[in-house]
A protein has these predicted regions:
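C-terminal helical subdomain
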Residues: 101, 153, 157-206
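A short, exposed helix-loop element centered on a Lys and neighboring polar residues
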Residues: 103-104, 142
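Catalytic loop of short-chain dehydrogenase/reductase
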Residues: 111-112, 117-142, 146-149, 159-163
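A glycine-rich helix->loop->beta "capping" turn
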Residues: 2, 51-56, 73-87, 91-95, ...
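Conserved glycine-rich cofactor-binding loop
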Residues: 13-15
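Rossmann-fold cofactor-recognition segment
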Residues: 48-66
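Active-site loop of short-chain dehydrogenase/reductase
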Residues: 5-6, 80-84, 97-99, 110-124, ...
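Conserved glycine-rich Rossmann-like NAD(P)H-binding loop of the short-chain dehydrogenase/reductase
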Residues: 28-43
Length: 206
């Protein structure tokens, strides 16, 4: 990667979000994790920094508009204009509106810079499964597609019908945002692994 990207990850205390943060930070990106469970992400970010990565954590409650506004100011101070937004909200507990409110604040600079990525993570991968979430995600990414025409900004969904190892999801998110500008991985469908007897035994030994 020739240049570090400024990355925001929401609801960042989930296993998938933590794995994504670790992978992107290890690759040289500036990563800010937004979460209500700041103690988890602050400790995790400190471990990443001890290894030379640029990772930070800040309080973010997507159900509280003032918290979102404070988080955006914190992001501007710590990592600058956001290049990548990874939304792992799961769209539960009233977070849907807040997730869009945050996106509406960080997307305009991407459009101005004619480069950026917005990645939505399906609720199963984010550790939740609210009714109708898939339809909401499809509607959201469809709206973003229309907004991003000709701007150089891309919208993607990483989704699955079941649980997938967090590290694998982090790898796919990294691939989506690292694709050349001429490519757009709009939908990444992850097929959950088949739990064969041998694989089940290996997992029990871990």
């Amino acid at each position: 990667m020739s240049q570090s990207r400024a990355v925001v990850i929401t609801e960042a205390s989930s296993p998938v979000a933590l794995a994504t943060a670790a992978r992107l930070a290890a690759g040289g990106d500036l990563v800010l994790m937004g979460t209500r469970r700041t103690h988890i992400c602050e400790e995790f970010a400190a471990r990443l920094r001890s290894g030379g990565a640029a990772a930070f954590a800040a309080h973010l409650d997507l159900a509280d508009p003032p918290s979102i506004d404070r988080f955006v100011n914190t992001a501007d101070y710590l990592i600058g204009a956001v290049d990548v937004l990874v939304s792992a909200a799961g769209l539960a507990d009233g977070l849907w509106v807040g997730a869009q409110h945050l996106a509406a604040q960080v997307i305009p600079p991407m459009i101005d810079n004619r480069h950026g990525d917005v990645v939505l993570i399906s609720p199963e991968l984010a550790g939740a499964s609210p009714a109708g979430a898939h339809r909401m995600l499809e509607a959201w990414v469809g709206g973003l597609d229309a907004e991003f025409v000709g701007t150089g900004v891309r919208a993607s969904i990483v989704r699955s019908t079941g649980q997938v190892p967090p590290d694998d999801v982090g790898c796919l998110i990294a691939a989506a945002i690292s694709a050349p500008d001429r490519m757009h991985l709009r939908v990444v469908d992850v097929i959950p692994p088949v739990l064969t007897p041998t694989l089940a035994q290996e997992r029990r030994r871990r």
